[in-house]
Amino acid sequence: MARGPKKHLKRVAAPKHWMLDKLTGVFAPRPSTGPHKLRECLPLIVFLRNRLKYALTGDEVKKICMQHFLKIDGKVRVDITYPAGFIDVISIEKTGEHFRLVYNTKGCFAVHRITVEEAKYKLCKVRKITVGTKGIPHLVTHDARTIRYPDPLIKVNDTVQIDLGTGKITSFIKFDTGNVCMVIAGANLGRVGVITNRERHPGSCDVVHVKDANGNSFATRISNIFVIGNGNKPWISLPRGKGIRLTIAEERDKRLAAKQSSG
């Protein structure tokens, strides 16, 4: 019987969205414990070495991190296996680049560059609202932040905008029909659309119906929905494709049209 924490991760057992090839080694970097789950995060070493190609080996990534060049959500991180997750802001001060981790429609984290202004805030989904000691209300977000004395109008499943400099809530978006959202889990991972309907199922999961910009409708559980803006206007910039999933035939037609226009 195994005792103690697991310290290794086989490459074939690593999450698919890390996009690691099977034949370049036996092991994959196991993410440290942190604000995001193992299957829903991207370790810094994978982001720097495999995505940005700023390093060739793990040792080079360690040397970059130990010089305090990398910040996640405004805080310096030196752990190369630190788990960055959905909507986190990764800043590299040496190059002046800022990235936000968001899903593309293939279900992988896109390398999405953002402006300096956008890197000053992030959105967080409200997971739980409780009352702590001495009657102090607490709000817990999807990235394990605990914020005291939130606005009484904020409810579970709403989205709060957090200033990364102060860590305080600057604004919030209600979970309501007509607001734009992104799917963060399940078969429709990475799709963006407007909430059209919410089916309530007491004792089970509520089902949310969403319509994307092309007019295609789909449904998913309420726990998979992350509201990202009021009305049709998202509060964060979206990666290429704007969260619209194309069918195989539509992708083929798009490729052919691009080839003909370039040729």
Swiss-Prot record:
Residues 42-104 form the S4 RNA-binding domain. InterPro entries: KOW, Rib_uL2_dom2, Ribosomal_eS4, Ribosomal_eS4_C, Ribosomal_eS4_central_region, Ribosomal_eS4_central_sf, Ribosomal_eS4_KOW, Ribosomal_eS4_N. Disulfide bonds: none annotated. The keyword Repeat does not apply. Belongs to the eukaryotic ribosomal protein eS4 family. Keywords: Ribonucleoprotein, Ribosomal protein, RNA-binding, rRNA-binding. This is Small ribosomal subunit protein eS4, Y isoform 2. GO terms for biological process: translation. HAMAP family: Ribosomal_eS4 (MF_00485). One of its GO terms (molecular function) is RNA binding. The keyword Ribosomal protein applies. The gene is RPS4Y2. GO terms for cellular component: cytosolic small ribosomal subunit.
